[in-house]
Structure formats: structure tokens, C-alpha cells
Amino acid sequence: MSATGNMLHVMAGVLRDTRGKVLLAQRPAGKHLAGFWEFPGGKLEPGEAPLPALARELHEELGIHVEPQDGAALIRIPWNYGERGLLLDAWQFTRWRGTLAPQEGQALQWQLPEEVDLTTLAPADRPILQALRLPPTYAITPADVMPDQAGIWHQRIAQAIERGIRLIQLRLPLWSVEQVRQLAERLQPLAASHQANLLLNRDIDGARQLGAGIGVHVTAAQLDDLQERPLPWSQLVGASCHDAAQLSVSVHLADFATLSPVAPTASHPDLPALGWPQFQTLAEASALPVYALGGMAPAQADEARKHGAQGVAGIRSFW
């Protein structure tokens, strides 16, 4: 997505040190959103290219030099602050030259992404942090798993967590609500020890009861009924989306969305596939991280990222 019309193109630099911590700057008194924390950067000057503009801003604000070729695209966030919209274009850097120090008297802090309190960030910067926290793959349990397979699937999910899967949706429609909650509770300590998140499908009350490390993935139908974010910022909320309208609603209710189907699927043969071009258009117009779902495999995560995705979500090929 390019900055057009009345949209202000703003660059944000995500600086990560060798400990994995990211740099945040506090907005000064007297400015819009004073006191909130944000990723350093600033707006493009007329005729300026995005990455050179970011390099200039980081030098002016922090006294460092970054090379545009060292930047990695993270996420682009269209955001509306009142009358004027902005496109917040976030790039990640792990290398820079010079001594980093505030050049404008601003407060700075280094924090691990998972330790940042999202409520202290400027609203448009929150999706940047979620993009840093969220993994490239999102595994969803098969819908045909029977309740008498609880032991087998407890083991499979535990093995997935131990081999590095960090985001798993427990979508088990043939199970009772209580059976799914019990499985999540049994897996909760292991997930916490690996900084993994388990998401219940639809079950907002269950996620509230189980607490830390247990989130919820809401359906497109649930999005229509929600008036506010269903869980605290400390618990993840995902949303199922199929079009631009649903993505727009999910921005203020969820931390991320799945967008489907990208490719034809046997489970939903009646739904036309989006294809990568349409997926990219929708994902880049959305102000939150979006996973590609539908006909996806873990090996396609890099391809998905080239088309504006956070990564890929899937069912069969992830187990």
C-alpha cells in the first residue's frame, strides 16, 4: 500500500539489540499522545524515498547511522488519528553505527517485546509490537479429532510446542467446551515455559477463566456481536476474516487475523480462493498482522511474508 491522498507516510524503525530487546521512545509533553511510547522515526519529506527518510530520522533522533539495505520490512499500518490518516511503515534493523543516545531530550528504553505493556504504546504502534511477538506459523487442530483421542492430541500438541510451534488454536468442534478447556489447562504450564500461546476457538469465557497464555480465536460471526476487545491485552485475540469489512472490524477487537482462503481447499470447496494478489491488497490495507490461511503449509511462510502476511496458518500440513 502506498501513501496517497491525505494519508501521511511515516517511517518507524524497530531497532533490536543482541539481547532481542527493542528500543522505544516516549512522546514528549505538548505533542499529540504525549507520554505514550513509540518506535522512533518520522514522516517523509517531499520527494524523499522511505528508507533514506528513516535513516535520516534515526540519525536526527538517536545519532546513529543505518544502511537502508540492512532494513527488513516488518509491517505497514494504515491508521486514522481523527481527521488525518497515516501509513506507519515499520522496518527492523539489527545493525547500526555510532553511539545511540537521545538527540531531542526524549526518554528511551530497551525492552523485550513480550515484556512491553501494550497499553503504554501509541495505538498505531501496538500492531508493530504484535508483529514482533507473533510467530511465522499458526497451527490449528483438525476439526475431525474425536474426544477419545484426547491423550493422543495432548501428546501431539506438546510435541509441537517442544519443536518450536508458538501459536496453536484448539479448534475441536466434536468436543464439549469443558473437554477443550481441560486440554488447554493441562498444556498451559508447558506452553508458558516455551512462551507459546494456546487459543480456544470461540470460547471467550473459557479464555477468561484460564488466564495467562490462553487466548481466543473468534469467528467472523462473533466479530459482528463484539463491541469491545473480549480479553485483556495480556491475552491474545485472533479473528477469522474473509473480506475487507471483517478485517476492518477486527482491528479494534483483535491482535491478529487470519484471511482465507488464499488457495482452494477441500474443507471449503464452495469459497473462491483469494489468490496472492488479492490477499496482499487486503492484508496491506489492514492495521493488524494477518496470517494467510487456506491451502497453506509451513514452508510457505516466507512466500506469505512477501505478500504482506505475518505468516501462514493451517491445519493438516502443520501436524
Where are these regions (language model features)?
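NUDIX/MutT-family hydrolases
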Residues: 90-94, 100-133
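Glycine-rich adenosine-cofactor-binding loop
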Residues: 139, 241, 273-283, 287-300, ...
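Glycine-rich phosphate-binding active-site loops on the catalytic face of alpha/beta enzymes
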Residues: 216-229, 256-270, 295-319
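Conserved Nudix-box catalytic region and its N-terminal flanking loop in Nudix hydrolases
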Residues: 21-61, 65, 74
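Active-site-adjacent beta-strand/loop module that shapes the phosphate/pyrophosphate-binding cleft
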Residues: 75-100
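Catalytic beta/alpha-barrel core
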Residues: 119, 140-142, 146, 165-179, ...
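Conserved N-terminal beta-strand and adjoining loop/helix that marks the start
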Residues: 2-22, 76
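Charged helix-capping and loop-helix junction motifs
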Residues: 153-155, 181-186, 271-279
